[in-house]
């Protein structure tokens, strides 16, 4: 019979093999980005000493005491030379919390810090918190904006599913100690808010996503833009929709900003998610657009369709057919690390460059919003290529 110590050694050996496994780029890409063979974080990547009581007296059978279900939707930042993710970790009890995982190279060897983040509560405590967007703002703080979920107080008796969503705000300078600021005041529910990294006209700028309910965007028109005077008492008084939803597109049901945009010489690069309905439920994909440096509310490029969709094993998980990203890192040499979750279950990385992503945005045809328009766009490319091939 295997002893407690032998089983414990096996647990740690298997864990160390997992977190030190070298990731491998997949070379069958589309020229825009490169996927990698292995997920960078799964529930199994959470430390053994989080999940198991290692005391042979209190846990003689070495049972898992605190189960972890998923690692997903992670904010990202380059910090002191390391690639940091503020990971949404979901426990077996369905509660999410934040934990920092760091890597020396951004593609593998991600290791969780010993303790998860202790996030201070708002005046009204939240039941669940998740999906943090990180922004190193020019005011000197790193802000994390995330969704705070609470049971809807207006729900009928017995309705234990209705919820409300607010944009919670916290800031830090070391990722250990966080200052919780009041939730964003808005005229609608908000679960998808991102802070622009620079002041605009002396104010803080937010990308928003107004919606009528906890899930449904309803009358919310798309990705919004708002200016606020003070992040310590942030209030949206006026919103402008800068990236609209459209019928029969990848973003007809709803869309939302992912991480904060990347500044390039030709404009701001944006990564977002789009949602449409299908027979299998809601399908989440990733898409890009660009806005002007002089006027960040003006869209200057909007490629048709998705840049990234679920493939292979990415399509299966707790919420299948979903890709979601709220974190990317642009290195000094122009390399871009795109961190995305698949099917609300695991984290992946894809790499590209600023030059490639700008080229993709500026030179990919826009959506014509009809089958006939799509055919005409395709015919133009076919004619050009046939001429080159002749």
Language-model regions: role of each:
Residues 1-73, 77-127, 136-194, 198-253, ...:
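Beta-rich carbohydrate-recognition and catalytic domains
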Residues 337:
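Short, surface-exposed ligand- or partner-binding patches at beta-edge/loop junctions that are enriched
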Residues 323-327:
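Extended, compositionally biased non-globular segments
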């Amino acid at each position: 019979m295997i002893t407690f110590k032998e089983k414990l050694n096996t647990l740690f050996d298997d864990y160390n093999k997992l977190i030190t496994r070298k990731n491998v780029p997949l070379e069958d890409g589309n020229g825009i980005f490169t996927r990698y063979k292995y997920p960078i974080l799964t529930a199994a990547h959470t430390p053994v000493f989080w999940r198991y009581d290692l005391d042979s007296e209190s846990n003689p059978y070495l049972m898992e005491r605190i189960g972890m279900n998923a690692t997903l939707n992670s904010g990202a930042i380059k910090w002191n030379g390391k690639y940091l993710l503020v990971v949404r970790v979901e426990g077996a009890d369905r509660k999410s919390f934040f934990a920092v995982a760091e890597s020396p190279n951004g593609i593998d060897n991600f290791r969780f810090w010993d303790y998860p983040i202790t996030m201070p509560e708002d005046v009204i405590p939240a039941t669940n918190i998740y999906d943090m967007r990180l922004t190193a703002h020019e005011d000197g703080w790193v802000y994390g904006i995330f969704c705070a979920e609470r049971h809807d107080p207006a729900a009928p008796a017995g309705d234990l599913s209705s919820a409300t969503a607010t944009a919670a705000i916290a800031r830090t300078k070391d990722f250990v100690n966080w200052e919780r600021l009041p939730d964003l005041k808005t005229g609608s529910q908000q679960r998808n808010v991102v802070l622009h990294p620079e002041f605009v006209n002396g104010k803080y700028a937010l990308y928003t996503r107004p919606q009528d309910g906890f899930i449904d965007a309803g009358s919310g028109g798309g990705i919004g833009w708002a200016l606020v005077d003070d992040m310590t008492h942030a209030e949206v008084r006026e919103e402008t929709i800068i990236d609209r939803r459209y019928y029969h597109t990848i973003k007809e049901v709803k869309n939302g900003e992912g991480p904060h945009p990347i500044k390039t010489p030709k404009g701001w690069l944006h990564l977002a998610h789009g949602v449409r309905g299908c027979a299998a439920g809601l399908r989440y994909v990733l898409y890009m657009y660009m806005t002007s440096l002089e006027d960040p509310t003006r869209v200057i490029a909007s490629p048709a369709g998705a840049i990234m969709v679920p493939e292979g094993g990415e399509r299966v998980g707790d919420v299948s057919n979903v890709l979601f990203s709220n974190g990317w890192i642009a290195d000094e040499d122009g390399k871009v690390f795109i961190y995305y979750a698949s099917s609300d279950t695991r984290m992946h990385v894809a790499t590209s460059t600023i030059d490639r992503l700008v080229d993709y945005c500026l030179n990919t045809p826009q959506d014509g919003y009809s089958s006939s328009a799509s055919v005409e766009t395709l015919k133009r490319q076919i004619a050009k290529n046939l001429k080159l091939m002749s």
